[in-house]
Regions:
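Structured beta-strand/loop patches that form or line metal/cofactor-binding pockets in enzymes
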Residues: 24-57
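Secondary-structure capping and boundary motifs in well-ordered enzyme cores
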Residues: 40, 67, 120-124
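Basic/polar, acidic-poor N-terminal "presequence/leader" segments
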Residues: 1-11, 46, 55-58, 63
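Short, thiol/selenol-centered motifs that function as redox-active sites or metal-ligating centers
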Residues: 62-71
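Glycine/charged-rich beta-loop-alpha catalytic/anionic-binding loops adjacent to active sites
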Residues: 49-60, 109-116
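Alpha-helical support elements that line or immediately flank enzyme active sites
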Residues: 71-83
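C-terminal binding/interaction regions
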Residues: 1-28, 82-143
Length: 143
């Protein structure tokens, strides 16, 4: 697939998650994390049910750009059913990808790969990582 076709596909995936967010909403009696990006105004509330060391459910609500909201949608899909350690590993891989670092590409990132081009735009990295930082905070505080 040519670079332009791949770029177009990634853009479509991002916009699909933005316009049709997965796992949008709030879970009652859950781990709750509120974060915002004061630079651009993005904000997210992440709620998760974690039982026996596994992320059973994850939902988010927020306001922000297409990158921050689609990243939150992708993240909630990716971490459901994962052990805490696996979810944190996925977050580390995503962070490394955003920072242009080497990362373990043996793990299938699914739709998350659509965000890899964000690393070319340093001002947008905080948008893409906001939900992931909420995930890390919630999982680390919930231990």
């Amino acid at each position: 697939m040519s670079f332009n076709n791949l770029d177009t596909l990634y853009r479509q995936v991002i916009m699909d998650h933005y316009k049709n967010p997965r796992n949008n909403g709030v879970l009652e009696d859950s781990v709750t994390v509120n974060l915002n990006n004061p630079t651009c105004g993005d904000r997210i509330q992440l709620t998760m049910k974690v039982e026996e060391g596994i992320v059973q459910e994850a939902k988010f609500e927020g306001e922000g750009c297409s990158i921050s909201m689609s990243s939150a949608s992708m993240m909630t899909q990716a971490v459901k059913g994962k052990k805490i350690e696996e979810a944190l590993q996925l977050s580390k891989i995503f962070s490394d990808m955003m920072l242009g670092k080497e990362y373990d590409d043996s793990i299938d990132l699914g739709d998350i790969e659509a965000l890899q081009g964000v690393c070319k735009f340093p001002a947008r990295i905080k948008c893409a990582t906001l939900a992931w930082k909420a995930l890390e905070k919630g999982l680390n505080e919930g231990k």
